[in-house]
Amino acid sequence: MASSSGNDDDLTIPRAAINKMIKETLPNVRVANDARELVVNCCTEFIHLISSEANEICNKSEKKTISPEHVIQALESLGFGSYISEVKEVLQECKTVALKRRKASSRLENLGIPEEELLRQQQELFAKARQQQAELAQQEWLQMQQAAQQAQLAAASASASNQAGSSQDEEDDDDI
């Protein structure tokens, strides 16, 4: 098993991943912290064991990259043959997901439009959006100016009517 040196944290499964796995597997069971730590250590040791065996199989077949087949052979040689069917299912699911991702990323490439043309179209759309934004700002400014003018006219009108009322009162006082 791995020693408890400072570099071991880099060689273990993240604790959050183990906690999630435990919750999904045993949703109604409380698991003590030391039991969680034991699960982390067991998982880490299992991965080291399988990867070491897969590496040996890879080296024997004079390959430089460990393939899924090497991992499957390692499971078999270490006595974990009962896991192989499930491992193959998960491998197929992973390949399907990877293929979907590649297809999604290549959609842009398959449009048949060169990247320069796409960038030009994007710049046109940005320019159009800036123009629309400027027009909206101009309209808002004009509306504010009109509102200010109307407020000034209303204030001037009120002031004029107040002055006219004052003049009338003075004339009435003169008549007395």
Swiss-Prot record:
PTM remark: Phosphorylation regulates its interaction with TBP. Not phosphorylated when bound to DRAP1.
Chief subcellular location: nucleus
Residue positions where Phosphoserine is found in the record: S105, S106, S166, S167
Functional summary from the UniProt entry: The association of the DR1/DRAP1 heterodimer with TBP results in a functional repression of both activated and basal transcription of class II genes. This interaction precludes the formation of a transcription-competent complex by inhibiting the association of TFIIA and/or TFIIB with TBP. Can bind to DNA on its own. Component of the ATAC complex, a complex with histone acetyltransferase activity on histones H3 and H4.
PANTHER family linked: PROTEIN DR1 (PTHR46138:SF1)
Complexes and interactors: Heterodimer with DRAP1. DR1 exists in solution as a homotetramer that dissociates during interaction with TBP and then, after complexing with TBP, reassociates at a slow rate, to reconstitute the tetramer. Interacts with NFIL3. Component of the ADA2A-containing complex (ATAC), composed of KAT14, KAT2A, TADA2L, TADA3L, ZZ3, MBIP, WDR5, YEATS2, CCDC101 and DR1.
Name of this chain's protein: Protein Dr1
Species of provenance: Homo sapiens (Human)
Gene: DR1
